[in-house]
């Protein structure tokens, strides 16, 4: 082979190697580009799905007036809820944004697990009962209690329309013994109804209601509870005494409740006595901070003279 032929062969080999290197580089670039395009496509699908969900939420987040002071609206979870349009406290918040007591709701949802048993004592429109039913699922159980016949009817309809067969609404008040009482209430302030003995004067509407003690309603030793939400405008002390056996056999139960010395006194119960009752059962209180986190509280502070109303978490341990 002549020097010229050798030089040409070497040049061909060099160019061939260069072409092979370029082909390999292009192949890597093509693979990288394909990966990036796949990521972009996936991201576009995620964004599209998000926008569709948001659009559906906006489309559904309308309040439909049904007549007779009744509307159907949607919680922020997308679940339907029936509302008394006269309610200027709870009802108006539900119709405006599907939310109520946001930091308290966040804590409540964090406590309720799939398959749990939840009691909603003072269910009102059924807001917490709906949240509970969503979270416990078909393997769980929700027992809700609301003596106001109007609100009980709305809450029952809400649970039914969402298909929560494992959730039940009892149109009764919860106390320390079986019996009868009167519920006084103002439709404009649906969260403020209170129980009293029959026969007294009233400036508000009055309804005769049945009172039940939960220990008598659920006497089975196998019946235990995981979470209790309770807001009964000062009747909490009596309601707790009526479920003492349930509390004793539910070691891990968490209770979210309103604690108001003034309202408890109006219901004929001393706040310190309620605190003592819970302490004797091993319960300690926690307050709820702005980030929905429980912070240790003291019974002495909660029951002190002039103490305000607090939404608290009561448990044996967290």
Residue ranges of predicted features:
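Phosphate/nucleotide-binding beta-alpha loop and adjacent structural elements of enzyme active sites
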Residues: 2-318
